């Protein structure tokens, strides 16, 4: 039976199940999607019409075509992100009411470039209103090279123009081997990390939850036995359902499940999508004295996220001014976007 415990059973299936506890609906049979982007066409059109009642099916089809077009831009998704996060014009997401959006999750959904034939399959993909905005790659625990291999793999994908639309569309990428961080090693060998798109290489960030009660007290939704069997059957591992190790790996407090709650719970994910990404033109001086400019995309570090949430809480309580204390040597320049 030990052979059944691989990435699927140790991390992937429990993670997909955990996302259902966070309010995502699992999809095991996807047929109506845009092949160039993996956008779920039926869900997208239905959601956009709901958020923009003045639009009809034809308008939404044209909007989808526009999105597919700009996702090919060599801009790390900047044009699309401006459209996604904007509070003006056509709404792709309702940022103020999570329940007014459609949340889906699936596993092993292939990203295929028809022209080159190149493809990759994220272990888990998360959708909001049909848009695949996050994916999770998992490795089994105690695989010394697992996280480093994932970092090398995503770097190759980011540099491959065949995958540009998929990378530009994906806002958040999470990588985990379901172990606690190795704080003695600066190289990301074990733990749960996150990053965003890049033109060259990914920067893996750690995430440390500031609210000790957030994960434990989150209002998780019950998941039906039918949904659990659906996921297990889709991944062809229903035989492990009643094994003790499988039950252990479903705990909300595993490293993978903790980062999913912290970053992909519906309210948190919407906050990140609205405020958590910045595009920066970095200038570098070459050996001959000339200068070159490179467009970079940055995602909030966890310190910035919790500072932002604290500011929002103060504003909600009528506080109009305050100070954020950023200690010496803690990366003020790197975080000041």
Regions inferred by a protein language model and the residue ranges of each:
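ATP-dependent helicase/translocase motor core
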Residues: 2-337
């Amino acid at each position: 039976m030990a052979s059944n415990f691989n990435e699927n059973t140790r991390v992937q299936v429990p993670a997909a199940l955990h996302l259902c506890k966070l309010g995502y609906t699992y999809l095991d049979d996807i047929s109506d999607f845009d092949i160039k982007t993996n956008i779920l066409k039926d869900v997208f059109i239905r959601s956009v019409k709901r958020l923009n009642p003045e639009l009809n099916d034809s308008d939404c089809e044209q909007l989808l075509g526009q999105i597919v077009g700009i996702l090919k831009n060599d801009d790390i998704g900047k044009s699309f992100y401006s459209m996604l996060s904007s509070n003006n014009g056509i709404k792709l997401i309702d940022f103020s009411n999570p329940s007014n959006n459609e949340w889906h999750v699936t596993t092993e959904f292939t990203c295929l470039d028809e022209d080159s034939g190149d493809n990759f399959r994220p272990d888990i993909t998360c959708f909001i209103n049909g848009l695949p905005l996050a994916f999770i790659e998992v490795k089994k625990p105690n695989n010394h090279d697992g996280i480093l291999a994932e970092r090398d793999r995503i770097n190759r994908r980011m540099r491959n123009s065949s995958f540009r639309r998929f990378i530009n569309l994906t806002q958040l990428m999470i990588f985990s081997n379901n172990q606690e961080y190795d704080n003695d090693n600066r190289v990301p060998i074990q733990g749960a990390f996150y990053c965003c798109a890049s033109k060259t290489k990914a920067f893996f960030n750690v995430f440390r939850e500031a609210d000790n009660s957030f994960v434990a007290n989150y209002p998780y939704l019950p998941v039906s036995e039918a949904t659990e069997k659906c996921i297990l059957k889709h991944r062809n591992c229903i035989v492990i359902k009643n094994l003790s190790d499988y039950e252990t790996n479903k705990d909300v407090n595993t490293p993978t499940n903790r980062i999913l709650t912290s970053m992909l719970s519906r309210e948190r994910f919407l906050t990140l999508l609205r405020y958590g990404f910045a595009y920066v033109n970095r200038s570098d001086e070459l050996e001959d004295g000339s200068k070159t400019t490179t467009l970079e995309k940055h995602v909030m570090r966890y310190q910035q996220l919790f500072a932002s949430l604290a500011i929002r809480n103060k504003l909600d309580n009528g506080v109009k001014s305050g100070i954020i204390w950023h200690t010496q040597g803690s990366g003020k320049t790197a975080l000041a976007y």
